[in-house]
Amino acid sequence: MLIIETLPLLRQHIRRLRQEGKRVALVPTMGNLHDGHMKLVDEAKARADVVIVSIFVNPMQFDRPDDLVRYPRTLQEDCEKLNKRKVDYVFAPAVEEIYPQGLEGQTYVDVPGLSTMLEGASRPGHFRGVSTIVSKLFNLIQPDIACFGEKDFQQLALIRKMVADMSYDIEIVGVPIIRAKDGLALSSRNAYLTAEQRKIAPGLYNVMNSIAEKLIAGNRELQEIIAIAEQELNEKGFRADDIQIRDADTLQELTETSKRAVILAAAWLGQARLIDNQSVTLAQ
């Protein structure tokens, strides 16, 4: 496994891979890797000749400076895990390598609508930062496929739209959420949880299951369903942030013709803002 930190060296290897006709898969990450990331790597390995994992804590997508500062950086441990998985390349650039002129005045990629709705409304600039860095990685690495986790449901929808709108010839692969045995979705931010909070954390998944059961049963009183769910979360020790029930295919409000719903949930537990989602097939 080769660790690459500079753009010239990355471009050199990408040119060689292209000349050799290799099928390249990209797994973009911000590091602090867990089993969910390893599932992305496994999916990439099954679909390509060469796997490149990027590790870059992207300052452009953080809406709070304190969150950027305390985001876990575990490059050595991450590389050890990826080496065991027989990843071919790790691209781990410094911020100055990606944004040599700084963020002020940086050209960015913005996806209208999806960037500012739902999660984007509560985290201004977040999705603009995501689409910009992913676009830069696509331009640099020129992958044939790129793997993203379905845990970040809105982010995946945003990337798919960007790829379509910008005419990238890249297959976007969504990989299902990996959960702990108690149902908690694996996330780098779970590291913020205390031992006691970790015991409470699966409650978010349980509340989503309760919402799903009501939707499957035909209940469409969405405001009431959400209000009850928020109350349940608060009683469990969370601070409910945002719960939405949307059309899984459009992320717009549910209509009578919606075939699938997605439950999008975000809640604070101590210093950790946990997000999760669950898709439900609706009776027609």
From Swiss-Prot:
Task: Sum up the protein's function in the record's words.
Answer: Catalyzes the condensation of pantoate with beta-alanine in an ATP-dependent reaction via a pantoyl-adenylate intermediate.
Q: Which residues bind ATP?
A: 30-37, 149-152, 178, 186-189
Q: Which GO terms describe its biological process?
A: pantothenate biosynthetic process
The biological pathway it contributes to is: Cofactor biosynthesis; (R)-pantothenate biosynthesis; (R)-pantothenate from (R)-pantoate and beta-alanine: step 1/1
Q: Which reaction does it catalyse?
A: (R)-pantoate + beta-alanine + ATP = (R)-pantothenate + AMP + diphosphate + H(+)
Assembly information from the UniProt record: Homodimer.
Binding-site residues for beta-alanine, renumbered to this chain: Q61
- What EC number(s) are associated with this protein in UniProt? 6.3.2.1
Report the GO terms under cellular component.
Answer: cytosol
Localization:
Cytoplasm
Q: Which UniProt keywords apply?
A: ATP-binding, Cytoplasm, Ligase, Nucleotide-binding, Pantothenate biosynthesis
**PANTHER family for this protein:** CYTIDYLATE KINASE/PANTOATE-BETA-ALANINE LIGASE, PANTOATE--BETA-ALANINE LIGASE
Q: State where (R)-pantoate binds.
A: Q61, Q155
Gene symbol of the encoding locus: panC
The molecular function terms of the Gene Ontology recorded here are:
ATP binding; pantoate-beta-alanine ligase activity
Q: What is any Pfam family matched here?
A: Pantoate_ligase
Write out the similarity annotation: Belongs to the pantothenate synthetase family.
Output the InterPro entries linked to this UniProt entry: Cyt_trans-like, Pantoate_ligase, Pantoate_ligase_C, Rossmann-like_a/b/a_fold
Recite the other comments: The reaction proceeds by a bi uni uni bi ping pong mechanism.
Q: What is this protein called?
A: Pantothenate synthetase
Annotated active site: H37 (proton donor)
